[in-house]
Swiss-Prot record:
General activator of RNA polymerase III transcription. Factor exclusively required for RNA polymerase III transcription of genes with promoter elements upstream of the initiation sites. Contributes to the regulation of gene expression; functions as activator in the absence of oxidative stress. Down-regulates expression of target genes in response to oxidative stress. Overexpression protects cells against apoptosis in response to oxidative stress. SUPFAM superfamilies: Cyclin-like, Zinc beta-ribbon. Zn(2+) binds at C7, C10, C28, C31. The gene is BRF2. A zinc finger (TFIIB-type) spans 2-36. It holds the Pfam family BRF2-like_C_cyclin_rpt. Belongs to the TFIIB family. It comes from Macaca fascicularis (Crab-eating macaque). One of its GO terms (molecular function) is zinc ion binding. It comes from the Eukaryota. Keywords: Activator, Metal-binding, Nucleus, Repeat, Transcription, Transcription regulation, Zinc, Zinc-finger. Component of TFIIIB complexes. The TFIIIB complex has two activities, alpha and beta. The TFIIIB-alpha activity complex is composed of TBP, BDP1, and a complex containing both BRF2 and at least four stably associated proteins; this complex inhibits the transcription by pol III via its phosphorylation by CK2; YY1 facilitates the TFIIIB-alpha complex formation. Interacts with TBP; this interaction promotes recruitment of BRF2 to TATA box-containing promoters. It is found in: Nucleus. This is Transcription factor IIIB 50 kDa subunit.
Length: 373
């Protein structure tokens, strides 16, 4: 307040009290000089006027992280480090986990669901950054059931309102094929089964693109299709030594799991290749089957676009044409009965009507006269 002495700097008597947080100060209103500062401690009489604030109404409860959430955040970071993801991926996955954990349905969920939530947040982050990681790979690391994981994954995506991009098949093929143990000789892999990585990867990509163009990938898990395409690519590079090797043995040599639908995808790919081979005259005379067509995969892929167009567009139209029998052609002799209503459609003038009536009457009279004996 004014009247409490003078400012030592400017000599003004306009001194006012100003509370800086909990510390009172005497400040000159003219120059802003702090004349005196109060102490931070309070007297016993001041403390008697204070009120107790319950913990539930303070900010400390909202800032505290439960043990379950702390454990989940550690699991997210550990999983990102095991997968060797960039640091930005780890931060994004942690943020998604914290957002999901704010929902009461997630906080009250069972421990199994919270464990799966860790993998879902990491998978969402990888999908958004186009990082080639499959749901099956995370399920293997977490020992989680694939059906349970997929249902919780869709629930989290919907809960957080995320827009997930489609998985890039090319990047997934590169990552998945790199894990095959077929690129260097070992006691478990004979020399005739060892293949160059770049050649095998290039042909596998072409076969996967062929499967995508012929609707073998849409709505299906990608790994069985990639496994079948990798097997065919590996066989076609050295068919003389590898045609006798089965898909199950191939997966065992490559040290990868055999997906259950991979055998069905293999048969579908072979059926597509056979239809393409029928469009080449020099292959049509060889009467290829699903075993021998593997030898000519390189030639078929070289002309893939034109052969697919011929096999699945013109071929479909031809099948539809064969299925429909042409209507029988009736021979017109001129003796067919023509109804009166049809004849009247062709009469235009009154003279034509009169001529038609006279001709009709003469015909009736001729038919009513009996024939002479």
């Amino acid at each position: 307040m004014p009247g409490r002495g003078r400012c030592p700097d400017c000599g003004s008597t306009e001194l006012v009290e100003d509370s800086h947080y909990s510390q009172s100060q005497l400040v000159c209103s003219d120059c802003g000089c702090v004349v005196t500062e109060g102490v931070l401690t309070t007297t016993f009489s001041d403390e008697g006027n204070l009120r107790e604030v319950t913990y539930s109404r303070s900010t400390g409860e909202n800032e505290q992280i439960s043990r379950s959430q702390q454990r989940g955040l550690r699991r997210v970071r550990d999983l990102c480090r095991v997968l060797q993801l960039p640091p930005t991926f780890e931060d994004t996955a942690v943020a998604y986990y914290q957002q999901a954990y704010r929902h009461s349905g997630i906080r009250a969920a069972r421990l199994q669901k919270k464990e799966v939530l860790v993998g879902c947040c990491v998978l969402i982050t990888c999908r958004q950054h186009n990082w080639p990681l499959t749901m099956g790979a995370i399920c293997t690391l977490l020992y989680a059931d694939l059906d349970v994981f997929s249902s919780i994954y869709m629930q989290i995506v919907k809960l957080l309102g995320l827009d997930m991009p489609s998985l890039c098949l090319a990047e997934l093929v590169k990552t998945y094929c790199s894990s095959f143990k077929l690129f260097q000789a070992s006691p478990s892999v004979p020399a005739k089964y060892v293949e160059d990585k770049e050649k095998m990867l290039s042909r596998t990509l072409q076969l996967v693109e062929l499967a995508n163009e012929t609707w073998l990938v849409t709505g299906r898990h990608p790994l069985p299709v990639i496994t079948a395409a990798t097997f065919l690519a590996w066989q076609s590079l050295q068919p003389a030594d590898r045609l006798s090797c089965s898909l199950a043995r191939f997966c065992k040599l490559a040290n990868v799991d055999l997906p259950y639908p991979a055998s069905s995808r293999l048969q579908e790919l072979l059926a597509v290749l056979l239809r393409m081979a029928e469009q080449l005259a020099w292959l049509r005379v060889l009467r290829l089957d699903k075993r021998s067509v593997v030898k000519h995969i390189g030639d078929l892929l070289q002309h893939r676009h034109s052969l697919v167009r011929l096999a699945f567009r013109d071929g479909t139209a031809e099948v539809e044409t064969r299925g429909k029998e042409p209507p029988p052609v009736s021979t017109v002799t001129g003796d067919e009965n023509i109804s009166d209503s049809e004849i009247e459609q062709y009469l235009r003038t009154p003279q034509e009507v009169r001529d038609f009536q006279r001709a009709q009457a003469a015909r009736q009279a001729a038919t009513s006269v009996p024939n002479p004996p």
